[in-house]
Amino acid sequence: MPDESQRIQSTASHGLNNTPEQPDPIKLDVHGQIPPWLSGALYRTGPGTFSIPTKYGYEWKPGHWFDGLGLNHKFDIKPNGEVWYRSRKSCPQAELAIMESGARSSFSFGPSDPCETYFQKFTTFFKRAAGMIPPHPPEEDDACVTLTPNMPGFAVPSSHTTNKVNGAEYIVAKTDADTLSILDPETLKVLGPAHYQDLSPALKGASFCAAHACTDPINGNVFNHVYKFGSSAGYTAFRIRGKGSDRGHLTVLTDIVDAPPAYLHSSCLTGKYFILCIWQGDIKWCVFPPLPLITLLNKKLSSQGWVNYPLPPQYPGCHCWLGPQTGSAILRY
């Protein structure tokens, strides 16, 4: 008989198996009863593809669970207690690109694949930095960390129409980079790309951001930050209006230029303050031109992940408390 640790390990291993998409809704078996007041649409997202055969004869596998390609899920809960389910891959074109190239060109959390050579990585990023590689389709961008219905500042692309689902005209899928996707709330199809920097020229050049934006439950305002590399490197905290005639308008709260680039997965929002907790999870970057692509190249050339561990004790964390209306720095330590 396997012991408890073996049983848990065996069960957890299923989380690394490929999950096929289910684009057409199917009725699920329900054990028990769901009260009518729970009816509605439940959206979930997360990694779903962890092994992709390549034309070179080997299988691509991510070095970290977070690096699995995304799968978006929708559960339609009916007033009569029925539950219908459908799912769709978030970046099918990225899967095809991996089959063809044998590697993934976007940033990753885990160690680099040893099958990817240094020269292959350098050439890919050099070409993309030089503009020699055309923009890739939006379905190659994998945003599969958080989903927000009707997020202010964004909209359904003019070339598409959608059906409202419980008031949602569109879904914004987010990740830890300024690479968002607009989803159809009914079919989960990727309608197009989206970026925070499209909302304001002040965010131009944004690379990283928090996948978990903060939303004020009273007025619907959305708070987040971006990090920009280069000559004007630093954090930019911002607010997107959630209601009123200026809904979707982005206001920069403050710029923080004297803190190191860190991996910030989320931030904090109270009734009075928007808080950035800049911890010691510094992102690796090069000493030569500090461009975002060069930063990612440096990460990809490393045999480690893209966050600089262990935590350096000589660099204390930094908490920035910002007034959500004015953006003034109330407290910093």
Stretches with model-predicted labels:
Residues G70-K74, S232-H249, V287-Y333:
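Beta-propeller blade signature
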